[in-house]
Amino acid sequence: MATYLVGDLQGCYDELQLLLETVQFNPVQDKLYLVGDLVARGDKSLECLRFVKSLGAAAQMVLGNHDLHLISTALGIKKVSLQDHVEAIFTAPDFVELIDWLRHQPLLVHDEKCDFVMSHAGISPDWDLDTAKSCAREVENELQHGDYHYLISNMYDNQPDRWSADLQGLQRLRYSINVFTRMRFCYRDHRLDFACKASVEKASQELIPWFNLDNPLFKVQNLVFGHWASLVDTPTPANIYALDTGCVWGNRMTMLRWEDKQYFVQGALKDYF
């Protein structure tokens, strides 16, 4: 049995299949973890959704910002982005089933046996692991059982940009969503920045990658995330695994076999823009 973790798919279905062939993935005995953003700018978002769903217990994903945006467009809250290629999802006979399945996916996964925590964008520099799990569950409960239409309608905002244990209701949920699905840089006082998507080398000196801030959790816990394609080839601490290497941007898709920490890469097969 092997455990594989793969970066953002963004509709790059063929590259995923080639990676799975390379590692000889066997869903009967292996497990595939996906850091989110199954859909968006690649041309096979529908195939990505169907495939991951078909794997059942052999796959585990976390929700990314593009996955949440797809749910939003399915609800009629937002329009499809001009850069996204998700039209086939909306005309698919299993459209409703796929969106319902997606809505029931988590924001955070803690594999205690393998000893890693996975989310799409990261974990707040102000959270310990218990707080991160609790905040993830709060959002997941609303998405899966609560008034998810109201939540999705009101998640598009950059505030609050700083954690407080006193945050309640929509403010608390929105902060958690932004941390789990949108965060990249923070200020030294731990405020979230949403403007900069650049590499660490090109960012303002006042901005710090979330994983480089002072949080005891970041020093001892294996953390796996995607979302930040411009981090490609940027060194991270030994226990921090950044898996989005920008396949949809013409770079490559990266898969990590957890047991021996071996990486497998597949270059983009086409220009998606």
Curated annotation (Swiss-Prot):
The keyword Hydrolase applies. It comes from the Bacteria. It catalyses: P(1),P(4)-bis(5'-adenosyl) tetraphosphate + H2O = 2 ADP + 2 H(+). CDD domains: MPP_ApaH. The keyword Hydrolase applies. It holds the Pfam family Metallophos. Its EC number is 3.6.1.41. Disulfide bonds: none annotated. Keywords: Hydrolase. GO terms for molecular function: bis(5'-nucleosyl)-tetraphosphatase (symmetrical) activity. InterPro entries: ApaH (IPR004617), Calcineurin-like_PHP_ApaH (IPR004843), Metallo-depent_PP-like (IPR029052). Hydrolyzes diadenosine 5',5'''-P1,P4-tetraphosphate to yield ADP. Belongs to the Ap4A hydrolase family. This is Bis(5'-nucleosyl)-tetraphosphatase, symmetrical. The lineage of its organism: Bacteria, Pseudomonadati, Pseudomonadota, Gammaproteobacteria, Pasteurellales. The gene is apaH.
